[in-house]
From Swiss-Prot:
GO biological process: translation
CC terms in the record's Gene Ontology section: cytosolic small ribosomal subunit
UniProt name for this protein: Small ribosomal subunit protein uS15
Organism taxonomic ancestry: Bacteria, Bacillati, Cyanobacteriota, Cyanophyceae, Synechococcales
Family, as annotated: Belongs to the universal ribosomal protein uS15 family.
GO molecular function, one term: structural constituent of ribosome
Organism: Synechococcus sp. (strain JA-3-3Ab) (Cyanobacteria bacterium Yellowstone A-Prime)
Length: 91
């Protein structure tokens, strides 16, 4: 269910801003998006797993807060990140 270390490292390398970046908002959003996608697939197979559904809603909320932070700080980076991750955003 959780991300494998190798998958996590690939995501970090793809979305990092510099060589030692592991925790920037962009990296956190990318990691959360990957976990959200995995959990969504799990919930399609197991619709009565309400604890996982709650966890999914919490992850979506955390990702939304991070995206709002990025949008306020740098709208250009926000649009680029949303496009790369295929995240729908309000216009």
């Amino acid at each position: 269910m959780a991300l494998l270390q190798q998958e996590k490292q690939e995501i970090i390398e793809t979305y990092r801003l510099h060589d030692t970046d592991t925790g920037s908002a962009e990296v956190q959003v990318a990691l959360l998006t990957s976990r959200i996608n995995q959990l969504s697939q799990h919930l399609q197979k197991n619709p009565k797993d309400f604890n996982s559904r709650r966890g999914l809603m919490m992850m979506i909320g955390r990702r939304k807060r991070l995206l709002n932070y990025i949008a306020k700080r740098s709208p250009d980076r926000f649009r680029e990140l949303a496009e790369r991750l295929n995240i729908r955003v309000k216009k």
